[in-house]
Structures are given as structure tokens and as C-alpha cells.
């Protein structure tokens, strides 16, 4: 494992990395990562999914001090940073520190002796970021997959460790560690049982932070199962937070998985967490065989198959199948579409394709409990596309941490000690720890350029471009000119009608939406009486005439939103006047000056009397406020406000004076021909100034 070593897929790296860890007798755990799905969604790229991570960091799980649990343990400085290089289309090791410092490690010496003193396993490499080796071809990169280079100072261990039981001394050590765990973390809980043969049968534990997490998010519970080479079983209990990120709330280790042990494990979980009756849904792996016991322990909860685990199962079955590469590629696309752009058609398509790679019993089981489970997919879809990506990525991170640590330990004792030492480490936000790269300038994809879309009905998309080195810091005007020049000629006049007939604010708001459309990949599909428009976000329904949309922007402002603009962009149509609410159109707006005053103040008689002048100002202010109120509504709400205003005017005018709502007095200018732009002409005698005061 050297700096600059390249790997075609993440599985290739994982194979070499596992061999490296076995050879050097060290354990690493995933710390930070940015998944390919997360990167593709946020940057509009199409990186291969077998890359899995565009950037991932692994750190040594061991500490520099003894195993006594402290709040801030000194971690071993060894780590590895793996990155994806787009030009090579390869993963490569960009940073590597192989200096291990383990305060309690027993490393075999070349002579075969062991020592309890602190040892350092060092490689003849310097820690420095590097770029992958580039040559005319990738022979060297491919060769590194077959013949990886390891450190010179190695410790030879058996690739298949012998099964080890828990001795009485080990039990005493575990009891001591758990006692210290409960003492240091106030509010933590632990329980273990010993069988007749004086072997550990079960261990359950959770920290105080885990308890708090379950109290806050008890509705959805997920069981993740891991089995190591010795046959021991680990169950991780996970919940979803409000961002739909997975968090571990409980661990349970079983020597053997039986009806009795699983029932006891679930019972201990309910004893530790008094809010267990609030659990509404429990998600399980398709291989979980104790659904009846789970239903008995959680009688009010629904037991559903986990979308995450079933998806990973289908991916594994597809990878191991003998299907041709083209079918595998199509099924991967179908699986991705079913999970992230869920629809009845996409699920039906995936179900049909899965029949070719699954045995009959498994296919029938998934067809009955996964493909056709309406509740499962309803819960999944209602949280939106972005939440689905966050959910899958966070589960990737957490399950990778749990599985790698549990499977890599040489003994169950070491595994338990490591899990207790780093119990709260599994809930770190690795997905968001890495810095976000600066955004690149984007441009709309020309209509003639083909689109690499995930959906067959994709119409248009985006491509990312970077400026030359000498133009990395253009001023705002240069950027604006460049972006405008990249708009296709057929779309230049798209907003002209809105710019000419609408207000400046309406044009600005709508133009912002148009910029989003230009810089996005949008999917347009017919959906009965409406058109589904999606910009890599929650889909919304747009009327066929383009006058309404279900998104919050259009509902609030009554302006063409990004979804309407995407529909117009697809059909090569401009924004029409009917798509803009009257309150944004110039001919309906009250003509006010820059400071809110009436444009033509000369038409208001200046009598020189402060009382009457003050009343004129009050009438103008009232007219302006009423105009604003009425311009903010349309349809039934406008009629209701208009009716209320007429009643107020009738009451104000008094029984002896009929309402003059539709009369146009000469003292005030009706610029919009609307019934609310009016003013009552003052007579010579006039009313006392006090009668002009209107309380509201």
C-alpha cells in the first residue's frame, strides 16, 4: 500500500486494503467520506457507482494509551486518504501515514518473541499529499491491483484466525471494562449474561448519548446484523434523525443466534429504553428470520424490509450473477431509479429484471414484502430525493464502521473492548466533515449536445466547465457576459414579455428561477392532466398551460417558477402574460415614487391648512395600503377583500352619502382603473379633522 497506488474500483482497493491490514495486524475504521451519489447529486457529475466514494479517509482504531475509557483518547496517528481522480478515472491513495503508535499492543518480533511494551510499526514512506502516477497507459495502475506494495516491517499472521472462546479471565476483564464504562459515562447502560459453560452468551450496551438519541427519534428503528468469522453476531440498533441521517442507539453481541437469545436481546433493549412503545416501524434485513419474535416484542410496530439492506442484497446478487455486462448496467440503472426516483413503473421494471438474478423463493419473498409494499415506499418517497440520498449515504458510513470493526478483530474480547472504547465514534458526521470544493462556473447544455441522463425521458442537463488559469478570478461583469453568451439564441427572448409587461421585481425573481433552470438537470414527464418537472429535487405538478405549479415559490408569488420555466424551456415557449399575477404587472400597479410617495403630488390641492393637508396625506396612505392588500390576492380571496372594503366604505360614507366606489374624483388619479384606487373630494365646509381618523 503506497502513496499514489491506483485502483479501478472500490472493491479492488478494499481487497488490497484488507490484505494490508491482515499483514500488518492493524485495524482501520472509516472516518470521513463523500459518496459518489452525494457528489453526483450536488455537482451534476456521472462518476461510476463502483467507485463508491470520491474521497474517503480511514484511521487506525487503536489508541496510544491503555484501554481505560477516557473522554478524549489519544488516537493512533496512522491514517489513509483515498481520492478519485477524474482524469484517470481511478481511485488513488493521496495521503498515507503508516506510523502506528499502540500503547498496549503486543507485536511479534522477528525472533518470534512478544512484548507488552509500546511498539511502532513504521514504513519507509513519508507523509505528503501526492498526485497519482500518470503514464501514457494505465499498465502500472492495473498492476498495482494484482501486486500491491506493502510495508517492509510486517507482522505475519494467519489469514484465518482460530476461533477463540471467552475464558473466565476474559469475563472478569469484560466486567471490569463495563463497570468503568458505566462509571465514566453517567446514564449509560450495559447488561451481559453467562451460560452454563461459563462463556459469554450475550452483551448489550448503550451510551447516554445513544439513549438521548432514541428519546428524540423513536419512531423508526432499523436492525443491522453483522457476523464475524468466528460465528459471533453483532446487532446495531439505528434510528433516523430529522435530517434522515442514521444514528446508532444500541449494540448487542450474541455468541449464537437463537430464538431465545434474540428474544432476550430485544427485551433488554426495551428495558433500557422506556420509550420503546413509540416505535412505529422496525426495518430489518431480508435475511432476518425472527420477525415473529420482533412483532411480539413490538406489537404496535410494523415490521418492514429495509430499503437499504434489500438494495445492497440486489447489488450483491447482480454482481455475482453470470448476466452479461449490458444487462448488469441496465439493472443498476433500474435499481438506482427505483430507490431515488421512485415510481410504480420503476419498481415494476426493477421487479421484472430482478427475477433473472434471484432464486424463485427469494424473488417471491421480495415481491410480496418489498416491491409491492405500498407503506414502505410511501414512507420512503414522502421525504424527498435529497433525504433518500442522505439516508442511504449515512447508512453506508455507519454500517461500514460497525462491520469493519467487528469483523477485523482477532478475538471477541478485543472486539468488545474496541466497541466500548469508541462507542460514540460511530455517530460522527463523516459525510459532512470534508470541506466542500469551491463551486465551478456552470453553463446550460446546448440542445444539440447529448445528455447523460439517468432517465429515459431526460430532456436537458448541464455540464461543468472551469475557466483557464489566467481567468480564475473574473469580475462580476465578465461572469455575467460569459453566462449570457452561453444561452442558446432560441432562449434569449424567453423572458422579454415579462420584462416588458411586468414589474422589475417580478422580472428579477423570475430571472433567478430561470438561472436555476439553466444550471440544472431537469426531467420532464407526462403525468395525466399535468406535467412532472423535476430539477434533482422534489417533483412538482405544473399545469399544462404553465399558469400554476404546486411548489411554494409559485404558490406564494404567483410567478413562473423553475418548474414552469423548465417546461417552457423544453417546449421552446416564452413566458406569457397570463402566467404572471396581476399584482406584478405594470398596468395594475400603483405608480409610486422611489420613496413610496404618489407620482403626481401636484393634483392634490394644497389649501395651506395643516388640518386638511394632514387628512389628504392620511387618505393617500390609506389608499396605498388598501391597494397593496388587494394586489396581493386573486380569485375568491380578492372578491372577499373587495367586498369587505366596500362595506367599510359604505359605513364610512354614512347612510346619507351613497358609496362612490366606482366614481373617479378629480383630486386623485386612478392610474390602474381598479376600484380601490380612489379618493373622496373634500368640500369647502368639510368635516371636522377628527372624523377623518379611521381606526383599524
From Swiss-Prot:
Keyword check for Thylakoid: no
Coiled-coil positions: none
SMART domains membership: ZnF_PMZ
Keyword set includes Transmembrane helix: no
Zinc fingers (SWIM-type), renumbered ranges: 531-572
Keyword field: Metal-binding, Zinc, Zinc-finger
Pfam families: SWIM, ZSWIM1-3_C, ZSWIM1-3_helical, ZSWIM1-3_RNaseH-like, ZSWIM3_N
GO MF annotations in UniProt: zinc ion binding
Protein's recorded name: Zinc finger SWIM domain-containing protein 3
Superkingdom of origin: Eukaryota
Source species of the chain: Homo sapiens (Human)
Amino acid at each position: 500500500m503506497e502513496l499514489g497506488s491506483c485502483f479501478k474500483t472500490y472493491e479492488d482497493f478494499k481487497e488490497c486494503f484488507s490484505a494490508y491490514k491482515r499483514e500488518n495486524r492493524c485495524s482501520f475504521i472509516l472516518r470521513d467520506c463523500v459518496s459518489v451519489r452525494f457528489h453526483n447529486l450536488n455537482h451534476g457529475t456521472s462518476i461510476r457507482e463502483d467507485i463508491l466514494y470520491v474521497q474517503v479517509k480511514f484511521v487506525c482504531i487503536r489508541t496510544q494509551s491503555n484501554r481505560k475509557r477516557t473522554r478524549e483518547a489519544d488516537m493512533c496517528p496512522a491514517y489513509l486518504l483515498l481520492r478519485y481522480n477524474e482524469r484517470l478515472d481511478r481511485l488513488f491513495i493521496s495521503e498515507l501515514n503508516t506510523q502506528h503508535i499502540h500503547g498496549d499492543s503486543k507485536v511479534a518480533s522477528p525472533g518470534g518473541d512478544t512484548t507488552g511494551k509500546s511498539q511502532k510499526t513504521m514504513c519507509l514512506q513519508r507523509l505528503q499529499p501526492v498526485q497519482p502516477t500518470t503514464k501514457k497507459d494505465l499498465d502500472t495502475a492495473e498492476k498495482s491491483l494484482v501486486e500491491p506494495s506493502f510495508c517492509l516491517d510486517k507482522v505475519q499472521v494467519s489469514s484465518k484466525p482460530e476461533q477463540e472462546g471467552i475464558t473466565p479471565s476474559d469475563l472478569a476483564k469484560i466486567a471490569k471494562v463495563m463497570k468503568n464504562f458505566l462509571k465514566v459515562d453517567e446514564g449509560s447502560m450495559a447488561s451481559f449474561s453467562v451460560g452454563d459453560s461459563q462463556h459469554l452468551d450475550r452483551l448489550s450496551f448503550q451510551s447516554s448519548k445513544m439513549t438521548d438519541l432514541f428519546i428524540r427519534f423513536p419512531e423508526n428503528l432499523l436492525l443491522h446484523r453483522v457476523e464475524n468469522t468466528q460465528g459471533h453476531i453483532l446487532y446495531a440498533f439505528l434510528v433516523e434523525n430529522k435530517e434522515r441521517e442514521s444514528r446508532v442507539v444500541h449494540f448487542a453481541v450474541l455468541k449464537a443466534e437463537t430464538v431465545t437469545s434474540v428474544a432476550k436481546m430485544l427485551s433488554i433493549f426495551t428495558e433500557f429504553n422506556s420509550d420503546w412503545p413509540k416505535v412505529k416501524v422496525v426495518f430489518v434485513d431480508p435475511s432476518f428470520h425472527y420477525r415473529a419474535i420482533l412483532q411480539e416484542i413490538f406489537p404496535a410496530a410494523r415490521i418492514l424490509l429495509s430499503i437499504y439492506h434489500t438494495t445492497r442484497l440486489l447489488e450483491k446478487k447482480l454482481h455475482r450473477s453470470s448476466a452479461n455486462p449490458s444487462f448488469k448496467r441496465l439493472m443498476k440503472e433500474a435499481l438506482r431509479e427505483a430507490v431515488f426516483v421512485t415510481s410504480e413503473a420503476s419498481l415494476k421494471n426493477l421487479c421484472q429484471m430482478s427475477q433473472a438474478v434471484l432464486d424463485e423463493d427469494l424473488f417471491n419473498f421480495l415481491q410480496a414484502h418489498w416491491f409491492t409494499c405500498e407503506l414502505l415506499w410511501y414512507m420512503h418517497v414522502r421525504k424527498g430525493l435529497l433525504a433518500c440520498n442522505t439516508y442511504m449515504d449515512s447508512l453506508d458510513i455507519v454500517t461500514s464502521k460497525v462491520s469493519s470493526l467487528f469483523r477485523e478483530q482477532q478475538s471477541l474480547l478485543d472486539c468488545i473492548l474496541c466497541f466500548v472504547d469508541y462507542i460514540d465514534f460511530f455517530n460522527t458526521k463523516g459525510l459532512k466533515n470534508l470541506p466542500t470544493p469551491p463551486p465551478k462556473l456552470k453553463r446550460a447544455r446546448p440542445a444539440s449536445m447529448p445528455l447523460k441522463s439517468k432517465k429515459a425521458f431526460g430532456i436537458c442537463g448541464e455540464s461543468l466547465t472551469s475557466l483557464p488559469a489566467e481567468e480564475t478570478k473574473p469580475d462580476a461583469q465578465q461572469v455575467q457576459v460569459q453566462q449570457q453568451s452561453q444561452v442558446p439564441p432560441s432562449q434569449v427572448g424567453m423572458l422579454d414579455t415579462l420584462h416588458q409587461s411586468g414589474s422589475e421585481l417580478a422580472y428579477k425573481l423570475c430571472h433567478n428561477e430561470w438561472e436555476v433552470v439553466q444550471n440544472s438537470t431537469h426531467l420532464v414527464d407526462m403525468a395525466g392532466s399535468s406535467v412532472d418537472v423535476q430539477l434533482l429535487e422534489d417533483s412538482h405538478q405544473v399545469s399544462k398551460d404553465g399558469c400554476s405549479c404546486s411548489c411554494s415559490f409559485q404558490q406564494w408569488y404567483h410567478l413562473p417558477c423553475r418548474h414552469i420555466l423548465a417546461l417552457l424551456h423544453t417546449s421552446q415557449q416564452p413566458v406569457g402574460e397570463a402566467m404572471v399575477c396581476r399584482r406584478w404587472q405594470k398596468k395594475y400597479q400603483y405608480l409610486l415614487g422611489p420613496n413610496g410617495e404618489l407620482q403626481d403630488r401636484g393634483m392634490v390641492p394644497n389649501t395651506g391648512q395643516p388640518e386638511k393637508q394632514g387628512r389628504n396625506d392620511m387618505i393617500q396612505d390609506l389608499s396605498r395600503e388598501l391597494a397593496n392588500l388587494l394586489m396581493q390576492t386573486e380569485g375568491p380571496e380578492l372578491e372577499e377583500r373587495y367586498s369587505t372594503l366596500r362595506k367599510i366604505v359604505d359605513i364610512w360614507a354614512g347612510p346619507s352619502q351613497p358609496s362612490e366606489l366606482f366614481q373617479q374624483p378629480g383630486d386623485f388619479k386612478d392610474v390602474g382603473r381598479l376600484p380601490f384606487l380612489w379618493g373622496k373630494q373634500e368640500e369647502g365646509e368639510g368635516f371636522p379633522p377628527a372624523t377623518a381618523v379611521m381606526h383599524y
